[in-house]
Amino acid sequence: MHPQDISISEYTYTLPSDRIAHHPLAERDASRLLIYGGGAIDEDLYRNIAAHLPTESLLVFNNTKVVEARIEFRKPTGARIEIFCLEPPAEYGGIANALTQTGRVSWRCLIGGASKWKPGQVLRKEMPGGLVLEARYKEKQGDTFLIALSWMPAELSFAEVLHRAGFIPLPPYIHRQAEAEDSRRYQTIYARQDGSVAAPTAGLHFTEAIFQSLAAANIRHDFVTLHVGAGTFLPVKSATLGGHTMHIEFIDVSRELILKLRDTLAAGNPVIAVGTTSARTLESLYWLGIGGKDLVVRQWDAYGGQDRGITATEALARLLDRMEQDGVRRLVTTTQLLIGPGYEWKIVAGLVTNFHQPESTLLLLIASLIGEDWRRVYDYALEHGFRFLSYGDGCLLFNRASMETQA
């Protein structure tokens, strides 16, 4: 069956509201860890994760940083308008560049209270320290709105403006306002690159102590960047997967990491992705390696049979050659890769991840990695009191077939 024909109703489960974690635990690494491999299920705490990883593994994390993408304005009438900055128009060449803009920028946004705001109207927000921010409604674009933002002092970057005027955008299933503590806890300790509107939540559990334990166990780690968009929360609303449009996200990967991945796989050692965003980035590298000149990954690129038996090491070698020819040290592009049941994993042998919403593309990704056992894993987690979603517990899932064959 082609993934486009998959019925979404087959990938659901009942998630009681009291199982959704609305606050993080006091200690990051005290979260529970479900371990699945070879059909067996076990559990531990995140602080002991090194004991469950193969020696010589390479863990790959997403070092994106959540920006304070929600801004609240008040109209002169007192009406509240909230702007949720999603992504810049294509003319800016990506999120990272748009965040460096000074004085003014345009952004695609979701609007809370949109019916109270008319095209052309300007909202004004004055902040302590002299920051004055104005927002003008330009036009509606599908489900989003194009908003022109300008500010004084004009020398401030948009990233600085968001930091001073905005607040952290918590997921829609966390039914509370963002608190001061969320600025720290809804952020990984290794977050470096501004650009996400949602955290790569699998990494929220990791602490300096865990990184020390990984090094002591001869388990290496490195980083990619994928800026997480609000599309990560969108449920699949179509009856089949073919009716769903996967969101496009920006990725940034260094030549050094691609070399490390190639050598790790060539030596027969496993690559473990920390988070679904890292997994999608890593798998996208394979398709970039065997793809065309435009160096982007589209939604269904993995399902056309174009791999023709090309191994992951060969694909990465081709990608490195292409980067050498182009004289680039970093690969900055976009991916729309949809990973669902029927996908043949190329690079990732294991995944550290949280528990995901029913009928989501993230749950489909889990099903593609461990097959129908995703039901056993989720049933176990529900029956044994695991906490779900962004601030919840997580799991370490191994794709044994991938670990045995990828080199």
Briefly describe each language-model feature range.
Residues 1-407:
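Surface-exposed, charge/polar-rich loops and edge strands
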